[in-house]
Curated annotation (Swiss-Prot):
<dbReference type="GO" id="GO:0042802">
    <property type="term" value="F:identical protein binding"/>
</dbReference>
<feature type="modified residue" description="N-acetylmethionine">
    <location>
        <position position="1"/>
    </location>
</feature>
<dbReference type="Pfam" id="PF01008">
    <property type="entry name" value="IF-2B"/>
</dbReference>
<keyword id="KW-0963">Cytoplasm</keyword>
<keyword id="KW-0597">Phosphoprotein</keyword>
<dbReference type="InterPro" id="IPR042529">
    <property type="entry name" value="IF_2B-like_C"/>
</dbReference>
<feature type="modified residue" description="Omega-N-methylarginine">
    <location>
        <position position="158"/>
    </location>
</feature>
<comment type="function">
    <text>Catalyzes the interconversion of methylthioribose-1-phosphate (MTR-1-P) into methylthioribulose-1-phosphate (MTRu-1-P).</text>
</comment>
<dbReference type="InterPro" id="IPR000649">
    <property type="entry name" value="IF-2B-related"/>
</dbReference>
<dbReference type="InterPro" id="IPR011559">
    <property type="entry name" value="Initiation_fac_2B_a/b/d"/>
</dbReference>
<dbReference type="GO" id="GO:0046523">
    <property type="term" value="F:S-methyl-5-thioribose-1-phosphate isomerase activity"/>
</dbReference>
<feature type="active site" description="Proton donor">
    <location>
        <position position="248"/>
    </location>
</feature>
<dbReference type="InterPro" id="IPR037171">
    <property type="entry name" value="NagB/RpiA_transferase-like"/>
</dbReference>
<keyword id="KW-0007">Acetylation</keyword>
<dbReference type="GO" id="GO:0005634">
    <property type="term" value="C:nucleus"/>
</dbReference>
<comment type="pathway">
    <text>Amino-acid biosynthesis; L-methionine biosynthesis via salvage pathway; L-methionine from S-methyl-5-thio-alpha-D-ribose 1-phosphate: step 1/6.</text>
</comment>
<feature type="site" description="Transition state stabilizer">
    <location>
        <position position="168"/>
    </location>
</feature>
Length: 369
């Protein structure tokens, strides 16, 4: 049975509550944008692609239930305002903001068409959200296959197996299915070319220990869990061939925001001459921002560091700094940036994506909500 973070059918949306993993697999029903926003903020669902999918599908569920209106102007305003709430839930990842921009503009255009009705605009917005789910799964398979082939060509072209280190959770639980960085690992495993996987626990929220380890065991992929502080030693002593991570936002020069701890992995990988890859869909690329210095970094509550399962583990009165993400400079991404459109060196990203996406009449400009 396929592991699913999101279960959707017209009028119905459920998410796998990732706070309860790995002990319990509990699906929670979301019937409104407000419920989706709370789930995203609480990290019951996380991962840049999954956040955008859940956000837009929650809007689709509300629209299917008759929310919005009366009148075209009121309906378009409802779509815009609900999407703005979702964008504010977790600001670092670009996927939700871009989807909100595209949906808002599309709803406004549809409403201006001759003969437009509330029903036609609703149907168009709902269909857009549903199409996102199918596209994300297709893109993930492409990322996995393209990344696996490129990694093998760079590290072991003679047909041997490779060992990969990954960080945080970038698999089926963070996407519509299959995953980005973990999708590359899945593809290597399916090809019979994966020797072993090392996944970091990913403090303070332990997405690696709770989620990635869960996925790897579920899929019977050979893997070992390590603490974040063991990564350098693993690269030296465990034969790591490459490091593959995901991304919440990749900007024009290739600088990449990803889960806190990614930056230090890239530094250590470069020191040891190990290729460092970023795997992300083009929807995670933000070409309006020139460098990573422009990325807004979300800061999380102090209790995520000071408490564990409701039990205080840090001294009372200690100060806490808890950024959820860090930015890896493009020069440390030595393997390449893996997208559904190909694998690119950071300096190639802007031209490559602009040429491909613009030829299809789309845009990768950062959303302005």
């Amino acid at each position: 049975m396929r592991l699913e973070a999101i279960r959707y059918s017209p009028g119905s949306l459920q998410i796998l509550d990732q706070l309860q993993l790995p002990e319990h697999c509990h699906y929670e029903t979301l019937s409104s944008v407000q419920q989706a926003r709370e789930a995203i903020r609480a990290m019951k669902v996380r991962g840049a692609p999954a956040i955008a999918l859940v956000g837009c599908l929650s809007l689709a569920v509300e629209l299917q239930a008759g929310a919005g209106g009366p009148g075209l102007a009121a309906l378009v305003a409802f779509v815009r305002d609900q999407l703005s709430l979702l964008v504010a839930a977790r600001p670092t990842a670009v996927n939700m903001a871009r989807a909100a921009r595209d949906l808002t503009h599309m709803a406004a255009r549809e409403a201006e068409l001759e003969g437009a009705t509330e029903e036609t605009v609703r149907e168009r917005v709902i269909r857009f959200a549903e199409d996102m789910l199918e596209k994300d799964l297709k893109d993930n398979r492409s990322i996995g296959d393209l990344g696996a082939r490129h990694l093998l060509e760079q590290t072991n072209p003679r047909g041997g197996k490779v060992t990969v280190l990954t960080h945080c959770n970038t698999g089926a639980l963070a996407t519509a299915g299959y995953g980005t960085a973990l999708g590359v690992i899945r593809s290597l495993h399916e090809m019979g070319r994966l020797e072993h996987t090392f996944c970091t626990e990913t403090r303070p929220y332990n997405q690696g220990a709770r989620l990635t380890a869960f996925e790897l065991v579920y899929e019977k992929i050979p893997a070992t869990l390590i603490t974040d502080s063991m990564a350098a030693a693993a690269m030296v002593h465990q034969g790591v061939s490459a490091v593959v991570v995901g991304a919440d936002r990749v900007v024009a020069n290739g600088d990449t925001a990803n889960k806190i701890g990614t930056y230090q992995l890239a530094i250590v990988a470069k020191h040891h001459g190990i290729p460092f890859y970023v795997a992300a869909p083009s929807s995670s690329c933000d070409l309006r921002l020139e460098t990573g210095k422009e990325i807004v970094i979300e800061e999380r509550p102090s209790q995520e560091l000071t408490d564990l399962n409701g039990v205080r583990i840090a001294a009372q009165g200690i100060r806490v700094w808890n950024p959820a993400f860090d930015v890896t400079p493009h020069e440390l991404i030595t393997g390449g940036i893996i997208t559904e459109l190909g694998v690119f060196a950071p300096e190639e990203l802007r031209a490559a994506l602009s040429a491909t996406i613009f030829s299809e009449g789309q845009t990768l400009d950062s959303p302005q909500m």
